[in-house]
């Protein structure tokens, strides 16, 4: 079996390395493709080591036809509008991030149009934005595949295309899916992380099947992305397999390596991404001061040890340690299967974090995990759907403190208990390993991929589709020929005009969406503005 694994960027290789190795061990040919060399600083060496043992092709092209900018504008706008769904309306940071990308993520000649569309959308109520998002979804369905992607897949002729992470700016992967569907190649989307279906935008093009971590993600696909539940399989989170199997470094050895006193209690601070906690160093300083001035002698003597988020590792240097009051900063070239992260948590009596997947790893080890709700973190916590999944009140491992003083009180109880956690075995099984807490997930991924290749093959009329592909590939070759360039572009422009006209018709005939209380602007006013925007230049 020949499998093409579209990773989007090299950095995303790390969550599926064991799955790829498992497929190759069963004799399957696996080629990984990436459109970017991006790798987080602390995962760079791990990724390079994986590359040495796997076949990785860097495909650097993006959509090449006259619809390239229009399709990007359409997808950026739809991501922005998608956050008007009832469950996502508190996700203000994610919505504003999408708006900023809409205004700044296009070629210069399109930025004025993008800014205009952004202002129009920002002035609409939630219901109106959702209606516009639905019109964009119809436009997406009518967007033809790009010949360059079709040719890329036609030459390789895989039995299956697997894509990840797909959502959040990996728009080239959607064009890869379009090309695969045109050729009759089955497509599986492997969900990358715990937050991908709520913080990274909408699923613009439906794959044939999706592999998810748990029942929560299956519901998210149905409720937020309108994806049919019968095309979803729950497998678990393979990225934690090695972490479940790890053993700790001896305490004296670990402490000696970082200048820590093994006799003192340790507290692990698990760093968040800067998008979640922009000024995390200031909070760490406040926490450190609160611990040192605590009336509890064990807390006052405790060493606060930071394990930075992979994306912020370069922000922490010697001066940062001194200014933040940390006892040590522990960073390593690993991202997954991180022995240092395991040791930091294992040798601590508790872990503290704002909103990070490392809190999940603390639960795997069995340490108490705490967060604190402060005004500066409100949007990153209350405004994040996935954050609620980890809270103790919802069956998760994380206990919430209402203030810094409350956090210190909870830490005092934890140190008195010797770091024993109340335990969250149900969370670990339902959220990470739904097929059994003792069952590694990567082999399940391999089994399901093998099963789906067989199950999905009859759904495709491969012969008919590939006959059409030959015609499209010929068009691509003709495009490069100077004498046919004008004809190709003219046809593309006609297709684009037809697409805009269709979208304008949909908008014109759409019923007025629900209005929010207090709004006086009529729906017809903004429908007309958007209609003019879509048909401008036709």
Features from the language model and the residues they span:
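Catalytic binding pocket for nucleotide-activated donors in carbohydrate/polymer assembly enzymes
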Residues: 204-207, 227-229, 234, 355-434
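C-terminal amphipathic helix plus adjacent low-complexity
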Residues: 271-275, 394-538
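Conserved N-terminal ligand/cofactor-binding loop architecture of enzyme catalytic domains
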Residues: 11, 25-150, 154-155, 471, ...
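A short, glycine/small-residue-rich beta-strand->loop->alpha-helix junction that serves as a flexible
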Residues: 5-17, 166-170, 276-278
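Active-site-proximal region of nucleotide-activated glycan assembly enzymes
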Residues: 52-57, 136-147, 160, 164-171, ...
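Donor nucleotide-activated moiety binding/catalytic core segment of transferases
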Residues: 153-154, 311-360, 365
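Short N-terminal targeting/anchoring amphipathic segment
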Residues: 2-4, 150-170, 349-353
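Conserved catalytic-core segment of nucleotide-activated headgroup transferases in glycan assembly
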Residues: 240-324, 328-331, 437, 462-465
């Amino acid at each position: 079996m020949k499998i093409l694994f579209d990773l989007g960027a090299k950095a995303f290789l790390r969550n599926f390395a064991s799955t790829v190795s498992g497929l190759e061990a069963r004799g399957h040919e696996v080629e990984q493709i990436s459109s970017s060399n991006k790798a987080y600083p602390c995962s760079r060496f791990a990724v390079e080591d994986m590359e040495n043992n796997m076949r990785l092709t860097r495909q650097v092209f993006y959509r090449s036809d006259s619809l390239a900018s229009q399709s990007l504008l359409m997808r950026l706008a739809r991501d922005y509008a998608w956050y008007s769904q009832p469950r996502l309306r508190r996700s203000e940071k994610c919505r504003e991030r999408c708006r900023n990308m809409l205004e700044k993520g296009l070629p210069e000649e399109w930025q004025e149009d993008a800014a205009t569309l952004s202002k129009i959308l920002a002035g609409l109520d939630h219901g109106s934005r959702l209606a516009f998002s639905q019109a964009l979804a119809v436009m997406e369905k009518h967007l033809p595949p790009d010949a360059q992607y079709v040719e890329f897949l036609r030459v390789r002729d895989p039995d299956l295309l697997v894509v990840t992470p797909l959502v959040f700016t990996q728009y080239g992967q959607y064009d890869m899916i379009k090309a695969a569907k045109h050729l009759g190649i089955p497509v599986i989307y492997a969900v990358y992380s715990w937050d991908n279906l709520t913080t990274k935008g909408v699923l613009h093009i439906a794959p044939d099947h999706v592999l998810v971590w748990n029942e929560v993600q299956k519901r998210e696909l149905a409720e937020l992305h309108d994806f049919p539940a019968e095309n979803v399989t729950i497998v678990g989170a393979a990225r934690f397999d090695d972490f479940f199997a790890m053993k700790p470094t001896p305490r004296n050895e670990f402490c000696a390596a970082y200048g820590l006193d093994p006799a003192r209690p340790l507290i692990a601070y698990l760093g968040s991404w800067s998008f979640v906690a922009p000024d995390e160093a200031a909070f760490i300083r406040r926490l450190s001061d609160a611990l040192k001035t605590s009336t509890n002698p064990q807390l006052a003597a405790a060493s606060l040890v930071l394990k930075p988020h992979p994306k912020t590792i370069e922000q922490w240097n010697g001066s940062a340690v001194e200014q933040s009051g940390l006892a040590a900063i522990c960073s390593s070239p690993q991202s997954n299967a991180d022995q240092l992260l395991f040791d930091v948590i294992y040798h601590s009596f508790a872990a503290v974090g704002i909103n990070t997947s490392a809190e999940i790893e603390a639960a795997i080890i069995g340490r108490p995990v705490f967060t604190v709700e402060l005004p500066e973190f409100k949007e990153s916590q209350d405004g994040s759907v996935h954050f609620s999944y980890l809270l103790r009140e919802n069956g998760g491992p994380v206990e919430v403190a209402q203030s810094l003083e409350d956090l210190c009180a909870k830490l005092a109880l934890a140190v008195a208990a010797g770091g024993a956690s109340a335990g969250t075995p149900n969370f670990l099984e339902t959220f990470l390993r739904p097929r059994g807490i003792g069952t590694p997930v990567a082999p399940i991924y391999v089994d399901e991929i093998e099963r789906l290749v067989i199950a999905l093959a009859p759904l495709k009329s491969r012969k008919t589709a590939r006959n059409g592909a030959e015609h499209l590939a010929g068009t691509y070759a003709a495009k490069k020929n100077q004498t046919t360039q004008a004809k190709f572009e003219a046809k593309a422009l006609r297709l684009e005009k037809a697409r805009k006209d269709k979208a304008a018709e949909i908008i014109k005939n759409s019923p007025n969406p629900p209005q929010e209380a207090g709004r006086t602007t009529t729906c017809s006013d903004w429908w007309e503005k958007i209609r003019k925007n879509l048909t401008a230049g036709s």
